[in-house]
């Protein structure tokens, strides 16, 4: 474990070391980490691409030799791969003409590759056609939904127009059409403090709606109790 991070509680002071009795002299103690390091230049060894070795080497010949070895290794492994591919890739009977069917004829890799290429091309074409069909169906569905939404919005707008105008809303029931032309009473017609600012003579004329400062004895309270409590 390193001791580099540990603090120095007792630093070295001159005159306190071994054989140091004069306090005026500086301390001769120093750390091993203060010693000079890497005092010698490191040169390339014999196996580390020294300049003398690089000058005497023929890199072109070495490259060509490595390429020949790689090609030889590749050709050595090819028969095994050809055998496995010929076994795994068998042509289908519906792709071979009837005149060429013979049990003694071996299946070559070229025929298998051509058949696999044709199969992959056919599969790709089928997938592209299916994708195009799906895109077309989605586009048609989107257009149909937009038309339905526009028709529904137009229908709602026309209904709002017809129902909002009482002169045009004459196609409903007779009672509703008759009631639509009748002026409705205000919601504050029978409140307690509606006509407080009017004169006393006017209030005396209306004995049924006389002003009473007690809410429990007012006409509004009586009507409310008779309507909702009794």
Swiss-Prot record:
Q: Where in the cell is it found?
A: Nucleus
Keywords annotated in UniProt: Coiled coil, mRNA processing, mRNA splicing, Nucleus, Spliceosome
- What are the boundaries of the region Disordered? 1-126
Q: Which InterPro entries match?
A: Cwf_Cwc_15 (IPR006973)
Q: Where is the composition biased (Polar residues)?
A: 22-34
Enumerate composition-biased segments (Basic and acidic residues): 52-84
Give GO terms: molecular function aspect only.
RNA binding
Q: Where is the composition biased (Acidic residues)?
A: 102-124
Taken from the UniProt entry, a GO cellular component term is:
U2-type catalytic step 2 spliceosome
Q: Which Pfam families match?
A: Cwf_Cwc_15 (PF04889)
Membrane as UniProt keyword: no
Task: Locate the coiled-coil region(s) and give their ranges.
Answer: 121-165
Q: Where are the transmembrane segments?
A: none
Which biological process terms from the Gene Ontology are attached to this UniProt entry? mRNA cis splicing, via spliceosome; mRNA splicing, via spliceosome
Question: What does this gene product do?
Answer: Involved in pre-mRNA splicing as component of the spliceosome.
Summary of subunit composition and partner proteins: Identified in the spliceosome C complex. Component of the minor spliceosome, which splices U12-type introns.
Task: State the family named in the UniProt similarity comment for this chain.
Answer: Belongs to the CWC15 family.
Q: What is this protein called?
A: Protein CWC15 homolog B
């Amino acid at each position: 474990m390193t001791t580099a991070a540990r603090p120095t509680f007792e630093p070295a002071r001159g005159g306190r070391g071994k054989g140091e009795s004069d306090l005026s002299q500086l301390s001769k103690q120093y750390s091993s980490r203060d010693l000079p390091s890497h005092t010698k230049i490191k040169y390339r060894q014999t196996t580390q691409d020294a300049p003398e070795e690089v000058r005497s080497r023929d890199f072109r010949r070495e490259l060509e030799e490595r390429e020949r070895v790689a090609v030889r290794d590749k050709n050595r492994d090819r028969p095994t791969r050809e055998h496995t591919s010929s076994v795994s890739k068998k042509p289908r009977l519906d792709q071979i003409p009837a005149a060429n069917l013979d049990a003694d004829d071996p299946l070559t890799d070229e025929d298998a590759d051509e058949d696999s290429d044709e199969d992959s091309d056919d599969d790709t074409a089928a997938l592209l056609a299916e994708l195009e069909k799906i895109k077309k169906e989605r586009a048609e569905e989107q257009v149909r939904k937009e038309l339905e939404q526009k028709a529904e919005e137009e229908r709602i707008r026309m209904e709002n127009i017809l129902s909002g105008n009482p002169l045009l809303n004459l196609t409903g029931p007779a009672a509703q059409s008759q009631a639509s032309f009748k002026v409705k009473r205000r919601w504050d017609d029978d409140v307690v403090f509606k006509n407080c600012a009017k004169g006393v003579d006017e209030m005396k004329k209306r004995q049924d709606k006389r002003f009473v400062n007690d809410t429990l004895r007012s006409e509004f309270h009586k009507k409310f109790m008779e309507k909702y409590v009794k």
